[in-house]
């Protein structure tokens, strides 16, 4: 990260919990969230939409059998908290699949590992699985249908003055999202 090189004295702590109060009450300066539900003491700046793809381990039966989102109902679906997937075809109407996850995890990393192990099918961010798809560790399912992307927000506390290092980090995150449209559009 260019930010770490520019600010070697700054301690970065990556926390993969969903507790937005950690930002509101000063434990963290900034959070990345896929929801804008927050208190009036926080600012949520829109960064873009995280591209998601549907993936499965190549040895899983679904890799050869799933041709349409409706086919997913017959398999174990893994979730990172959601119970609905919305699919948009290249042409035509969208389709919503409501499901009861066979397994639900509170973070993408765990869902990713479970998918790699063949536990089931998951909708995961493309940035997380791009290399696995290229190396044939995961198979992309129904590529003619796009999973509805998740909106991404940068959340931080309202203040009268923001330190330069925080402004720089905000700028670098915004720039990264703008220049990596295959992940965040």
Regions inferred by a protein language model and the residue ranges of each:
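C-terminal regulatory
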Residues: 22-25, 37-152, 179-185
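Solvent-exposed beta-strand sheet faces enriched in polar/charged residues
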Residues: 13-17, 141, 155
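Short amphipathic alpha-helical coupling segments at ligand-binding clamshell hinges
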Residues: 161-175
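A bilobed periplasmic-binding-protein/Venus flytrap-type ligand-binding module shared by bacterial periplasmic
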Residues: 152-161
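Generic non-transmembrane alpha-helical segments
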Residues: 2-6, 172-180
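Central regulatory/effector-binding core of bacterial HTH transcription factors
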Residues: 1-40
